[in-house]
UniProtKB/Swiss-Prot annotation:
TGBp1, TGBp2 and TGBp3 seem to act together for cell-to-cell propagation. TGBp1 is the main movement protein that physically cross the plasmodesma with the viral genome. TGBp2 and TGBp3 would facilitate TGBp1 function. InterPro entries: (+)RNA_virus_helicase_core_dom. This is Movement and silencing protein TGBp1. GO terms for cellular component: host cell cytoplasm. Belongs to the Tymovirales TGBp1 protein family. Residues 116-226 form the (+)RNA virus helicase C-terminal domain. One of its GO terms (molecular function) is RNA binding. Homodimer and homooligomer. Interacts with capsid protein. Interacts with host AGO1; this interaction targets the host protein for degradation, thereby suppressing the antiviral RNA silencing. The keyword Transport applies. It comes from Potato virus X (strain X3) (PVX). It comes from the Viruses.
Amino acid sequence: MDILISSLKSLGYSRTSKSLDSGPLVVHAVAGAGKSTALRKLILRHPTFTVHTLGVPDKVSIRTRGIQKPGPIPEGNFAILDEYTLDNTTRNSYQALFADPYQAPEFSLEPHFYLETSFRVPRKVADLIAGCGFDFETNSQEEGHLEITGIFKGPLLGKVIAIDEESETTLSRHGVEFVKPCQVTGLELKVVTIVSAAPIEEIGQSTAFYNAITRSKGLTYVRAGT
């Protein structure tokens, strides 16, 4: 536990007032904060840590065990579960829980540590995310390209992501290929178009919108409202 806490502090995580005696250590970080990278380094340096994820596990490597799907935990190891908010039935075997609660807020717990700074999301996109009510900032040096128009006021470029049923229906009616936010989890996309039936000022703290727009690392287009 001490090694993990020291690592979190060195990475700039902030401490909340929640007592460390209350259940597993809960750590929250926004998209692009380097959470998974930090966990991989922890495993590499300290073999007594085991990290499982409810998200996408690492590919098999000859160098390290990496982040694995849930399974047996070696006796005596400190067990960490990443993406714990994706399910509330798997967490009991773990001594630390990591997640971005904005991606799946339903099962999130009160954290002991948090980091609301992304190192990947472009500045213009980060400003839009914050403007929708999320505690979110970025240290990225990329300004990024962000264009916001009505659904029919601009082209649909790159990966098209529909964030509500009405926009799915509209895109299907016009024969446009699209994906849902859950289908791009963990991806980093150079060109993204997000389609919303609601205008941008009405989106607010939409989980679907957050999951979609945080996939962008380059050109971002939002087609929202009429």
